Curated annotation (Swiss-Prot):
Belongs to the RecO family. Pfam families: RecO_C, RecO_N. The lineage of its organism: Bacteria, Pseudomonadati, Pseudomonadota, Alphaproteobacteria, Rickettsiales. Keywords: DNA damage, DNA recombination, DNA repair. It comes from Rickettsia typhi (strain ATCC VR-144 / Wilmington). PANTHER family: DNA REPAIR PROTEIN RECO (PTHR33991:SF1). The keyword DNA damage applies. This is DNA repair protein RecO. It comes from the Bacteria. One of its GO terms (biological process) is double-strand break repair.
Length: 236
C-alpha cells in the first residue's frame, strides 16, 4: 500500500550505514515512520529534522514500518540551529508531538497551525507564540484551557486565575478567596500588546505544565527537551 502526503520530519535515527528511520508528522495521516537511505549529501540535507517534505510511504501491509521517500519543500533547519532559543523551542515542539500524539492519527487542523508556527519561529523566537503552541497542543489532545471569560460570573474582564479542575478562567473577585488553590493567569495571554516579564513566563509554563502533568505525562514523566527549553528560557 502507498501513502502520499505533506509532512514535517521530526525524528531521524540511524538504523545502519547510510540507512535511517525517519518519523514524519503528516497533514492527513498523523505520525508515520519509514526507512530511508541517505547516502549522498543532497539526500542527507533533505532528511533533516524540521524540513517540510512531500512524503511517500510504501509497505506491503499497513502495520509494517514501510519504506519512505521524500522531496524537499522547505527547510527550516538552518534557521533553528543558529539561535539557541529557536533550537530549544523546536526541540521541545517535536518531542511533545511525538510524546502526545498516537501513531497514524490525523491532526490536519493542528498540522496547519504547526506549519504557521514553524514559519514564524524561523523568522523570530516569540515566547507568546510558543505558549500558544502548548495551549493548542493541549486543546488538540482534548484538554482545552478556556481563557475567554470567568467560568462563574461570565465576565470577560479582570481575569486573574485558572481553575485546575475545570481548566477555565476566574475573575479576581471570584477567585480571590481560593487563590492558594488556583493557577495564575499571565496577563500577556489576554493582551497581544503587553510586554512579557520573566515572572509571567514562569506562570505560563506552570499553567501548561500542570495540565500536561495531570492528563498527559503519565507517571510524572517529563519531556526532556521541554525541560531544557524551560531551563534556558527562564534564565536568559
Amino acid at each position: 500500500m502507498n501513502i502520499k502526503d505533506i509532512g514535517v520530519i521530526i525524528s531521524k535515527k540511524p538504523l545502519k550505514e547510510n540507512t535511517f528511520i525517519i518519523r514524519v508528522f503528516t497533514k492527513n495521516h498523523g505520525l508515520y515512520s519509514g526507512v530511508i537511505k541517505a547516502s549522498s549529501k543532497k539526500n542527507k540535507f533533505i532528511y533533516q529534522e524540521g524540513n517540510i517534505v512531500d512524503f511517500l510511504w510504501q509497505a506491503r501491509l499497513h502495520e509494517h514500518i514501510g519504506i519512505a521517500k521524500c522531496e524537499l519543500i522547505k527547510s527550516y533547519t538552518g534557521y533553528f540551529i543558529i539561535n539557541k532559543a529557536k533550537l530549544y523551542a523546536f526541540n521541545s515542539v517535536k518531542f511533545l508531538i511525538q510524546e502526545l500524539f498516537h501513531e497514524r492519527e490525523e491532526h490536519s487542523i493542528f498540522f496547519a497551525f504547526l506549519i504557521n508556527y514553524l514559519d514564524n519561529l524561523s523568522k523570530n523566537f516569540c515566547f507568546r507564540d510558543y505558549i500558544n503552541f502548548e495551549l493548542n497542543l493541549l486543546a488538540e489532545t482534548g484538554y482545552k484551557i478556556d481563557l475567554t471569560k470567568c467560568c462563574v460570573s461570565h465576565v470577560t474582564t479582570d481575569l486573574t486565575y485558572v481553575s485546575p479542575k475545570s481548566a477555565r478562567a476566574l475573575s479576581y473577585k471570584v477567585g480571590k478567596p481560593y487563590r492558594d488553590k488556583l493557577l495564575i493567569l499571565p496577563k500577556f495571554l489576554l493582551s497581544e500588546d503587553s510586554k512579557i516579564t520573566l515572572e509571567e513566563k514562569k506562570q505560563a509554563l506552570t499553567l501548561t505544565n500542570y495540565f500536561f502533568n495531570r492528563y498527559l505525562f503519565h507517571n510524572n514523566r517529563q519531556v526532556e527537551a521541554r525541560k531544557e527549553f524551560i531551563e534556558y528560557i527562564t534564565n536568559i
